[in-house]
Amino acid sequence: YTSKNDLIAEKCRNYLTEEELEVGTKSAVRKGRELEPLIIHKHSQVMGRRVIKPTDMYRHKSYPFIKFNFDGVIDKLYNEDGTYQYIPDEIKVVTIYGMKHYQPKKATFSEFTGWQLIPPHYENENVGIEQKAAMYGIPPYYYTQLQQQIFGLNAPYGFLTVMFEKDWQIHSWFVWRDQKVINQLIMEDAKTWNIIENKRPANFDLGVKIKEDYN
C-alpha cells in the first residue's frame, strides 16, 4: 500500500479495482512470484532445514484483526527448552534500483562470502524503526513486516532473505524479535481496524468480489 488511507479504502470495498486486478501482471510482481521458490530452495540448502511455503492466510487468535501471509517458514528448529519452533523467512527479489536500501556487508549470510556473526539485539536501543533497520542493514518496511511475522509465529527471531537481481546473489539477514516495535504495530493495527469497521456499511459482504462492468 502507498498509504494507510489506501489500505482503509481497500478494506471498505467488496470488489477489486482495475488497478488491483492488474497488479499480478506487473513484471516486478511476476518476477518475485516466479523466483521465490528458487530463493526458498537456496536458503533451505544453506540452513540445512526445510523451508515451508504456506499457502493460507492466518489470523491471530488474540488479535483477529491481524492477519499474516508468510513467504517462507523455516521448519524443524527447536528452542533451548526443547520446544518446537517455526521461524519466519521473508523472501524478496531486489531490483537494481532497490539495492540501495540494503547493506549486504551486514547480512548474516551471503552466497559468495558465507556466514557472519549474528548481530546484537537492538530492541532496547533508544532509536526509531528507521535507525534499527539501518543497524541490521535492511529497509524499515521489511523490518516492521518481519516483526509482524515474528509475532505471528511467536518466534525469537526471523530472517529476511533476498536475491539481488543484478548478480543473482542470495543474502540473508538475521533479525531479533523487537517487542517494542511489535507492541506499536498491534496498537496501530487496532486503530486502523476501528476506522475500517466504522466506515463499512452494516451489511458489508466480507467476500471479495471482482467488480463487474455494466457499461
Where are these regions (language model features)?
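Accessory terminal regions of nucleic-acid processing enzymes
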Residues: Y1-N215
